[in-house]
Amino acid sequence: MVPRSRCPHCGHQITALENVPVLSWLCLRGKCRQCRTPIPVRYPAVELLTGVLAAASVWHLGFGITGIAAALFCCVLVALTFIDFDTQLLPDSLTLPLLWGGLLLNLTSGAMAPLSDAVIGAMAGYLSLWSVYWLFKLLTGREGMGYGDFKLLAALGAWFGWQALPAIILMSSVIGAVVGVSLIVFRNHGRQQPIPFGPYLAGAGLAMLFFGGQVMALMGMGAPVSVMATGG
């Protein structure tokens, strides 16, 4: 990737051999090769999580276009999750390719949803959160979420079709509410302090990828595509 990774403490440029996921951290014993500053365990943990999800998606959907696309889908969602936790932002450089990737996959194979459902899902995903955003702003004068959340839900709609949106919104909202209340009660998180919504949308997207059939059945909805029916 450009620019090359550097140690935030001493500025040492990370070489290719020092940047092998998980293995490099183990070989370096969790420290920068130059200044010996400890490297947070979060880095290899995120790398391991990404690898496990990517491998699971290929195992789940097979080693083909759909499985590889799903692996990339998982990688982008993990990246968006931790970027949003750190910065309260969901960059267009990730959300927009995710959206177009879902449309392209369904255009070429219809593996996740028919193209018409994917296009409607992208539009409905964006407009649903956009509407909530402006309604909340009109009522309170504050911004309840960011535009990146709209684009992420649009991307999930492009992947799974409009039928999956109610389940995705419900799952992410419930999990987000539980986490938010827990932070306020147990960790003295300020009521006016923002809580990122992107990670919970991403989690709901992963749930739809692996367990879409069960989720839709549990909510009394028909699974729109054969891929969802194979979930789990």
Predicted regions and their residues:
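Membrane-proximal soluble regions of multi-pass membrane proteins
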Residues: 1-42, 197
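Select subsegments of transmembrane alpha-helices in polytopic membrane proteins
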Residues: 40-47, 92-94
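Zinc-dependent deaminase
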Residues: 45-83
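Functional transmembrane core segments of multi-pass inner-membrane proteins
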Residues: 67-175, 217-232
